[in-house]
Amino acid sequence: MAEGRCSQGKEPAEAMISLVALGEPLIQLNAVTPGPLRYVAYFEKHVAGSEANFCIAATMAGARCSLIARVGDDEFGRNIVEYLRGRGVDVSHVKVDPGAPTGIYFVQRHFPVPGRSRLIYYRKGSAGSRVGPDDVDSSLISSADAVHSTGITLALSDSANRAVHKAFGEAKRRTFDTNIRPALWPDLAAARRAILDVLNYGVDVLVTDPDDTQILLGVRDPEEAYRKYRELGVQTLVYKLGAEGAYVFWNGGSYFRDALKVAVEDPTGAGDAVAGYFVALYLSGVDPRRALDLAVAASALVVGVRGDNEALPSPREAEELLKAL
């Protein structure tokens, strides 16, 4: 197994691939000061949500990315659409739903565990949870190089779950981030059933971590996890280890990328940065080791600020960080 820093393989491809992500964009209210939210006086507002973050990361890495979603007919919904459009994401398939509000969540930082954040959601009955199969444009799906979603979207509602199944059933290629959020599921058995059901479509790139894999497969070891995921039809596995780094396993090889040592302001969004960056580069033909190097660098920049996606770099900026550290 290769380890450490790697500059092998092609530079980020010039050919632009087309991706579609399906999931809920949210408004994030991030505590300006660390500690319990009951004593926080000021919050910063950011646009976030796993698939929205994925799209911005993929766009920064050189892909085209369209988001299928719903937002409320409110100021937060308009904020999301305008912000994503400004970041280069195609929002022509984001519908405005007058019957439900835009979802929000709060970020509690560095409490009770320093260096970690806790997320408190207010998204039940949100516009984003009402996305369904009718929102999935078959012509958009068939024209895309790959479709991406997450375990979060599967958990939102029955209609959102069915939307993912429709999109994955029509997609040329599929990428998926397990992203198990226990607070969104009735129990972990339900999460396991729903995610394994989606993996049956055959996933080209799976992004996950030991905690989610323990729930799904009952194992934590990276190599054992890859063997079991391969049996389920997964082609390439990105296995995140948080502050330690990440593995990538593919047909014929494996590689470990150590994490970059940076000051952590808020780790929220780091995994989405890895997913979007890696998928965009890897599916465009970049060597998986090179793609993971740049994806880990992108995530290192994300955790240094509040907000999930404002610090996402260009490949040149990610490379500059790799050379500096």
Swiss-Prot record:
What's an example Gene Ontology biological process for this entry?
phosphorylation
Q: Which residues bind ATP?
A: 179-181, 240-245, 269-272
Main enzyme class:
transferase
**Binding site residues for substrate:** 49-53, 105, 121-123, 181, 272, 308
Q: Does the keyword ATP-binding apply?
A: yes
Q: Which Pfam families match?
A: PfkB
Annotated active site residues, numbered on this chain, are 272
Key words of the record: ATP-binding, Carbohydrate metabolism, Kinase, Nucleotide-binding, Transferase
Q: Which domain of life is it from?
A: Archaea
Q: Recorded E.C. number(s)?
A: 2.7.1.45
Entry's transmembrane regions: none
Protein family (similarity comment): Belongs to the carbohydrate kinase PfkB family.
| NCBIfam families in alphabetical order | KDG_KDGal_kin
This protein is called 2-dehydro-3-deoxygluconokinase
What gene makes this protein? Answer: kdgK
